[in-house]
A protein has these predicted regions:
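Active-site-proximal alpha-helix that buttresses catalytic centers in soluble enzyme cores
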Residues: 2-343
């Protein structure tokens, strides 16, 4: 009998329309799903913060004429993966059909609603967090909502694709992507800033956060990617640095910021800066707006290397990961026996 497997590409999501009716729910869900994990905010304060964030973002993005494209890229990723998985008809002697959907924490269609839709029609669910660095604020949100939805039966029907940051093939994919997109200016001394979302290292009480903020994973991913770039024969970067994009509130944030990287580049005589947002899988306002503006304001000539987005090599690799997880779902016993034989 054919097994139907739902594949959910889940990420934060950014609004596409800069209206109050789109921005305010977005800001509210950020506070509800993320901020509430580290701070217990009274309802009136939460509403006020969401309002201020909405008004500030609407004003700033309109002034800059910035049009968010994250959701559009996410849909392209979903379409490309669905098309690629159409070629997979059978796994472990079981006929399969993939149902691929995009889902979001902060914009519609909300992740929990998509879970409701696919539960009735799918034999299993594969969750693909489109954020390569794991933390309680990234894939942790999806895992929490999934556990809340499926309860004790979650492990029978759900698989989560994880540890992208620690996957050698994924890191090699990033390295190739960088050098394929890079416009080499050998007459200049070029620095590479590997950009990611910043993380908390201490809470407001000066103590280590009780939740996993993803700091250790961010550093490990950066160090592995940097080493792989430096080993590559195509490498001509004079300097490679981590560029974290921090927020202002919530405690003490990591010190390896993009601002510090730019200051160190200046001291090293760097003449041009290349940005690659390694901490994201799709271009978003933190990468193609905020990071770009910070480099430009520092006075550097800039090359922006896009995220992996819907690049064919990335989609092919992701499809392989999905197929492996699907094998575990449709034939768990067969999969275990296969792994034992390999060992």
């Amino acid at each position: 009998m054919k097994k139907k497997i739902a594949v959910l590409l889940v990420t934060y999501g950014e609004v596409e329309q800069l209206s109050f009716t789109h921005l305010y729910p977005n800001a509210w869900r950020i506070l509800h799903l993320i901020t509430s994990r580290i701070a217990n905010l009274p309802l009136p304060l939460k509403a006020f913060i969401a309002l201020m964030r909405t008004l500030r973002r609407r004003k700033e993005w309109k002034r800059l004429r910035y049009q968010p494209k994250l959701a559009q890229i996410n849909r392209k990723q979903t379409t490309a993966l669905a098309k690629r998985l159409e070629t997979v008809k059978q796994l472990a002697d079981c006929e399969v059909q993939f149902i691929v959907r995009d889902a979001y924490y902060f914009i519609k269609p909300y992740y929990e609603n998509v879970l409701n839709e696919v539960e009735a029609i799918a034999d299993g669910v594969i969750v693909v967090p489109m954020i390569p660095i794991e933390s309680d604020f990234a894939c942790g949100v999806g895992c929490y909502l999934t556990l809340e939805h499926f309860g004790d039966g979650v492990f029978e029907r759900v698989r989560v694709i994880k540890h992208l940051w620690n996957n050698s093939n994924f890191i090699a994919l990033c390295v190739n992507h960088i050098f394929e997109k890079l416009e080499a200016h050998r007459e200049r001394k070029v620095g590479l800033a590997l950009v990611a979302h910043g993380t908390l290292i201490k809470d407001t009480n000066g103590e280590e956060p009780k939740v996993n903020t993803g700091y250790k994973e961010t550093i490990a991913f950066y160090e592995r990617l940097k080493a792989a770039i430096e080993r590559d024969r195509r490498n001509s970067f004079a300097s490679i640095k981590l560029g974290a994009m921090n927020h202002k509130f919530g405690g003490t944030w990591m010190t390896e910021t993009l601002g510090r990287a730019l200051e160190e580049f200046k001291a090293e005589g760097i003449e041009e800066v290349v940005i690659f947002p390694f901490g994201f899988l799709a271009d978003n306002s933190e990468a193609d707006l905020e990071a770009v503006m910070e480099v430009q304001q520092a006075g550097y000539p800039l090359q922006y290397i896009p995220c992996l987005n819907d690049s064919p090599d990335f989609i092919d690799w992701l499809a392989e990961r999905v197929a492996l997880s699907a094998t575990q779902l449709v034939q768990p016993q067969t999969f275990r026996q296969t792994q034992i034989k390999k060992v």
